[in-house]
Amino acid sequence: MSVMEEAEQFAVPGVPDAGAEVVESAPQRVLLVWDAPNLDMGLGSILGGRPTAAHRPRFDALGRWLLSRTAGLAAGRPDIAVEPEATVFTNIAPGSADVVRPWVEALRNVGFAVFAKPKVDDTSDVDSDMLAHIALRRDEGLAAVLVASADGQAFRAPLEDIARSGVPAYVLGFREHASWALASDTLEFVDLEDIPGVFREPLPRIGLDSLPEQGAWLQPFRPLSSLLTSRV
């Protein structure tokens, strides 16, 4: 019996040979996509104007929450590498670069990648860029996707398709503007104000304990049509 034959005889099943090439699988991403133009508009409508420092989202707190969520997903998949990816997509209006630069640099300083696109007309929004990036990461391997946006027209169908494939899909935003996500049977909704530390002070959202003298409408959490679905 040759030395090679003897080695094969005593090989342990399931244990790779010392000389064999070990191929590591690519890490799966927990992808966060922040739709800055959309959320800026939504926050402005809640505040009735531009946010002060107390009401601007804290991306360091959001990043810590994403890391915690990633760790939870990784704990259930010990055989797969899971990595977080935090991204912000924004438009840069002509002449606003100097104003926006400190914000962009602050985002990059806490680990967020920023996709910035010139805003030259109504067709130069970043919706298609966000969807393309989600599709790219899905092809490479997604552990979960989290989209911070109220734009159901752009995101509902692709996110529900991802969720149906078995990948958790979350929508982050303000419940006043996210009835489409709340009504979905496949998407999970997280209100940004429920994430610890994202806002330094409570947002002035209208509730029963904060009604104006003239009264106010309290919008439904989900559309009436959701009564026709299984999720009531």
Task: Mark where each language-model region is.
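Actinobacteria-biased recognition of intrinsically disordered, low-complexity terminal regions
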Residues: 1-26, 208-232
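Domain-level signal for Mg2+-assisted phosphodiester chemistry and nucleotide/NA-binding surfaces
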Residues: 2-124
